[in-house]
Amino acid sequence: LAQLRDACALVQHVSRLVHQLQKERGLSNLYLASAAAQGAGALSDQAQAVNGSVATVRAALEAQSLNLSGGHGARLFSAIAYLLQGLDALPALRERVHAQALPVDQSTAAFVRLIAACLAVVFEAADSACDPDISRLLVAMFHFMQGKEIAGQERAAGAAAFGSGLSDVARQHHWLHLIELQDGCVQVFAEFAPASPEMRGWEDVEQNPAMAVIERLRRVACTAREGERLDAALGERWFAACTQRLDAMHRVEGHLADELVQLCERKLAIACSVLASQQVLLREEEEKEKENEKEEGEKEAEAGSVHST
């Protein structure tokens, strides 16, 4: 349980890093698709925000890697190692984005791989949970994070579409697929999430005014004919509306992570209390056994003395 508590704390840090990386991915797409006409200043600021989260996660990963054991521990260690490789490659990716030296699709794919490495750490932490209550909450959180990641991919796809100023049928199909995948993740989340304010918080996200903007811009982009002009100025409006939604989702995610750590702490406290009680009972049994042995010894000595007399 102590290992699981530490793993859940790691999930908190990884969740924050994913949120920052998702935003950098979207801004990178806006920057590349608009030929650096949009998003340059925000992208630079966002890189600094990501760097702060990376430093926190590196410290947490280093601490976590020292306390891994067993088969689940080996898989979590492998996921951590893969994530660290991805983080090491991030500066080179940024240089290519800044120099506009790679297509939007390649930039998106690189960020998707890095975020997938983050989610793999969360998945392995969830897979290592032996307590059913903790496991259930971890499954709910993993699917919520996965749904949020797909929503982040939709933000990036829309930023690229509007930034380019042209409709593309292949991108439209991919866009609609992302919407469908989000719905699937939310269904699993709803199945495993506890009846709590976090669940109601998700319902509030879907009723946020930003969703009306997102729905309208989805229709604009996904119903346009192949090669039809899209208003490039809508790119920043799309990005802002999606960011409002993703920020709200991140708050729900944060509540889930806090509840997860608190649940681990409660379970650990109960386990420690039970263990302490068992140790007290064991000591009492040992003391009784010693007293019985002493009494038996005294009786034997007394019997021997009588026999000699």
Per-segment meaning from a language model:
Residues L1-T309:
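Hydrophobic alpha-helical segments
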